[in-house]
């Protein structure tokens, strides 16, 4: 008896049952066997680094435990035991290095926090430098005020014009009318100050006579060194001829700091103008005293260079 296999076309298959999918029909005919499970075998000679009390399979509880491990760069589970830090050496089978692309947020947070906090040493050093600077400024102001009271030598610092600030250089103009160049002196070392003071007393009478005959020239406007100061401008009625004259030396040592400090001690407003209240310069204001002395020095230097030209 012949049996003929019934062929059922695919388009006539039912949407359910054993003929629903071609994959099911192939799987029912092919002898498929499951793959064998992987088995791990402990190597002889390795130290026992796992405790029998805890679970051997890592779980989600190990994640927080690994995150708390700050001193090691590799991950390990809770069951790892380390007798001594200097004796324990991880084997290649257990070491899992940290991926370099994954950032370590714990270390980054500490580094950023350290950068945000200012250094206590740097703050203390800055405060000490500021205190030292204030003390030096006060000492220089006291020296300038003391020397200026004993030796008032200054040119006319105020201009009659209210719109421009300049300086009157009458001593340089009067030097042309004097036969010998005795109307000026040269700023030199401190050892020659006594001789210069004696010569200045002899010249005061001659300078007063000549300065009254010659009018003051127009004051220059340019300055090579700028300083912050506050001066009251007197009118023409209160202008009086200066009694002292100043002439800078022709040497090239004006840029030297020592020469600048020596000249600062010898420059000051005249006593008449200071008594009349024509200036708001105060002795206790060290910055104003220093800026005033530097202003006089550099203006006199510029005028001396222009006269030589």
UniProtKB/Swiss-Prot annotation:
Manganese is among the record's keywords: no
Superkingdom: Eukaryota
Acidic residues biased stretches: 190-211
Pfam family, one: Mito_fiss_reg
Modified positions (Phosphoserine) in chain numbering: 253
Subcellular localization(s) per the UniProt record: Mitochondrion outer membrane
Topology term for the membrane: Peripheral membrane protein
Record-level GO cellular component terms: mitochondrial outer membrane; mitochondrion
Keywords: Membrane, Mitochondrion, Mitochondrion outer membrane, Phosphoprotein
Stretches the record annotates as Disordered: 189-221
Entry keyword annotation includes Lipid biosynthesis: no
Main subcellular location: mitochondrion
GO BP annotation list: aerobic respiration; mitochondrial fission
PANTHER family linked: MITOCHONDRIAL FISSION REGULATOR 1-LIKE, PROTEIN OF UNKNOWN FUNCTION DUF729
Family as reported in the entry's similarity comment: Belongs to the MTFR1 family.
Its job: Mitochondrial protein required for adaptation of miochondrial dynamics to metabolic changes. Regulates mitochondrial morphology at steady state and mediates AMPK-dependent stress-induced mitochondrial fragmentation via the control of OPA1 levels.
Protein's recorded name: Mitochondrial fission regulator 1-like
């Amino acid at each position: 008896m012949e049996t003929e296999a019934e062929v059922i076309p695919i388009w006539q298959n039912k949407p359910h049952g054993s003929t629903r999918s071609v994959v099911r029909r192939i799987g029912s005919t092919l002898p498929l066997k499951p793959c064998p499970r992987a088995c791990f075998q402990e190597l002889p000679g390795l130290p026992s680094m796992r405790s029998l009390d805890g679970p051997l399979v890592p779980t989600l509880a190990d994640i927080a435990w690994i995150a708390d491990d700050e001193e090691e760069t590799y991950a390990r589970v809770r069951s790892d035991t380390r007798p001594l830090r200097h004796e324990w050496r991880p084997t290649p089978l257990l070491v899992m290095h940290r991926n370099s692309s994954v950032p370590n947020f714990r270390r980054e947070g500490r580094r950023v926090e350290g950068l945000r906090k200012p250094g206590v040493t740097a703050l203390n050093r800055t405060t000490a430098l500021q205190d030292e600077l204030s003390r030096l400024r006060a000492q220089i102001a006291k020296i300038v005020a003391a020397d200026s009271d004993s030796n008032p030598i200054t040119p006319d610092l105020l201009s009659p014009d209210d719109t421009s600030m300049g300086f009157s250089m009458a001593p340089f103009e009067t030097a042309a009318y004097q036969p010998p160049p005795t109307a000026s002196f040269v700023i030199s070392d401190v050892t020659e100050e006594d001789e210069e003071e004696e010569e200045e007393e002899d010249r005061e009478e001659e300078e007063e006579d000549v300065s009254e005959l010659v009018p003051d020239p127009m004051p220059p406007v340019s300055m090579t060194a700028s300083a912050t100061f506050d001066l009251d401008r007197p009118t023409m009625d209160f202008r009086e001829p200066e009694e002292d004259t100043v002439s800078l030396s022709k040497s090239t040592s004006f840029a030297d700091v020592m020469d600048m400090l020596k000249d600062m001690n010898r420059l000051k407003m005249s006593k008449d103008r200071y008594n009349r209240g024509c200036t708001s310069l105060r002795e206790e204001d060290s910055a104003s005293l220093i800026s005033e002395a530097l202003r006089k020095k550099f203006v006199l230097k510029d005028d001396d260079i222009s006269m030589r030209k």
